[in-house]
């Protein structure tokens, strides 16, 4: 019985982990920071809710780093949104993603159909990585 319970728990954990990774696209790997992203609606149940950019960032270095960045949304060459400057500390090999990590961005009134247009793009305005002794 314990073995069956352990196998079931392992299966559920694996399925949840895979679900959490699903849907992310690779953006870039710069200065030892691997960036992946995905777009989704703010409310899964409301087709008219705003589009949200979720980032998943991994420090692929063997040292801790302080990462300072801004995110910008563009309509063609026109900047329509820029986030405030953010700074996060990552231990060696650490990954973070989504809202709780401060890696979720949206612009009020911007819908999924807007981000799917050919003229729409997003990029980092600031992308600075500095090695630190430790994350406090």
Feature map (PLM): residue ranges:
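Short acidic, flexible loop segments centered on an aromatic residue
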Residues: 62-79
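Intrinsically disordered, low-complexity Pro/Gly/Ser/Thr-rich segments with frequent PxxP/GP/PP motifs
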Residues: 77-114
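Low-complexity, acidic Ser/Thr/Pro/Gly-rich terminal tails and inter-domain linkers that flank the onset
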Residues: 21-49
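Short, surface-exposed coil-to-beta transition loops
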Residues: 50-53, 66-68, 81-85
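Short, well-ordered beta-strand segments enriched in hydrophobic/aromatic residues
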Residues: 53-59
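Sec-dependent N-terminal signal peptides
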Residues: 4-16
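Terminal connector regions
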Residues: 102-136
